[in-house]
Amino acid sequence: MYVELKHINKHFGNFKASDDVTVGIEKGKLIGLLGPSGSGKTTILRMIAGLENPDSGEIIIDGKVINDVPASKRGIGFVFQSYALFRYMTVFDNVAFGLKIAKKPANEIKERVHELLELVGLSGLEKRYPSELSGGQRQRVAFARALAPNPQLLLLDEPFAAIDAKVRQELRSWLKGMIQKLGVTSIFVTHDQDEAIEVADEIIITNRGRIEQVGTPYEVYSNPTTAFTASFFGQPSIFKDYSKFRRFDILENAENAIVRPEFVKVTKKTEVQKYKNSAEEGVVEEVDFRGYGIELRVRVNGVLLTARRSFDQPRIEVGEKVDVFIYRMFVTQGDTATLLENKSLREPVVVI
């Protein structure tokens, strides 16, 4: 592993921000640190950067323990959420700042700055000041400045949080492509699930100072190993007694059932339902327009479920009785999560 954290603990007063954190990151990977507020993800990033010191444990980069190495000597580029650009410096001088501190030759600085501005798509803006740039352009300057000294590791603290939605979407794709091109090992902090899934090669899920799960976006989303990870993604409906729903195995010591919108199919009484005999009757309580389609809130057996339908399907109204089929659900037992499939999926289909 290129970056390793071994049994890291960190307290802020009585608050335990990192609780025996142990994780490894391969060289060249783009890693997303994902979790709710207060889960410890930013603390991990700041300890790797040298901006905070762990109470115990080891931080290792490229085989070397760096706990006692000052932040300025770690060879790490850091992109702050607020950009942290120098207001009274031009774009050129902002990008060149670290190189000047390192006393690099003027011709080398000029060449490197122009190379990076071309890389981030800001050629020709060298003489502008941060106040003359858009939010997306400022963030690109911050990326270029962090990359200027050729860091061995790039850290990004919620890099898209201060940017509007459209530009944020564009920058996600741009960042992923840029880091793949450069091959620099990178770690970014986010609380945005979609952002982590879209950008990261691997995701580290944090919760209450601990690592919940590590895996590819597909693995952590589709195969959660803990109750927290199963409930964290999407807009799940969480309820206690799932035995009221048909055709699911009953697990001993089951605690909660977790049903995501994509696990639910809602059809009008007049529509074809592949699993009609296994469907439950529900009553629609909410119908909301979303950019991707229609979102429904349907009460079934006393449980309020969220489901989605496309625009080209027949319209469903509030108060309408509908057929609801649950394909699958996660069931938690203690801290583990098990995926259960509706038994009807394994049986011959009768279309009614």
PLM regions: where:
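ABC ATPase nucleotide-binding domains
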Residues: L30, A71-G77, Q81-T225
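The feature captures the beta-strand-to-loop junction immediately N-terminal to the Walker
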Residues: L34-P36
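ABC ATPase nucleotide-binding domain helices that frame the ATP-binding cleft
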Residues: T42-L45, V141
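Helix-to-loop junction immediately C-terminal to a conserved catalytic motif
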Residues: A49
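Conserved ABC transporter NBD signature motif
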Residues: G57-V65
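Glycine/charge-rich catalytic "coupling/switch" loops of P-loop NTPases
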Residues: S237-V287, F311-I352
